[in-house]
Amino acid sequence: MECLQQDTWAEVEQVQEEQQEEENAVSANAQRVSITQAAKLHNVTRQAIYVAIKQKKLKASKTTRWEIDLQDLEDYRRNRYSRAKSTYQGELLFDNEKGFYSVGQVASMLNVPEQKIYYATRIGAMKGERRGSAWVIHVSEVDRYRNDYLKKEAERKGKNLSAMREGFGTLGASELLADSEDFVS
């Protein structure tokens, strides 16, 4: 026959307190993450997190390893540097509402590489303004460049395509013509 031991009320209470302490310790650990975990959460390198800690932009403590509170990590994410919030002499650098865009934004609007926009500003085909170290381009310049240069470039490609059609037509190479149209467009 099996003998069951009955716990006294004090023993049951003590066990419950120990379980509560363990749960609190687990939740406290869940609120803190390592540098590696923080980097994975924010899609940055461990070095970026470490630099933020050293620059005192991110609060962290070190016992055996760096530990970062999740709330501090969230505050850092909200307040970290962003070019969208950059100011120059008190005004937003890239104020899209006023029509000012960065080179990257203009390149994506025109569906061309950024280097083409830098080149256009350098040769004077597109007027841009330097504000600090950044190029700022107004939307009117983007429209002018689109109409003056990109449409002419598309027309030139169209003329080249028609010349290719004539050349391939005289040679009787219709398969090559279809391939070239796919290549040009």
Swiss-Prot record:
It comes from Chlamydia muridarum (strain MoPn / Nigg). This is Uncharacterized protein TC_0731. Pfam families: HTH_17. InterPro entries: HTH_17. Belongs to the EUO family.
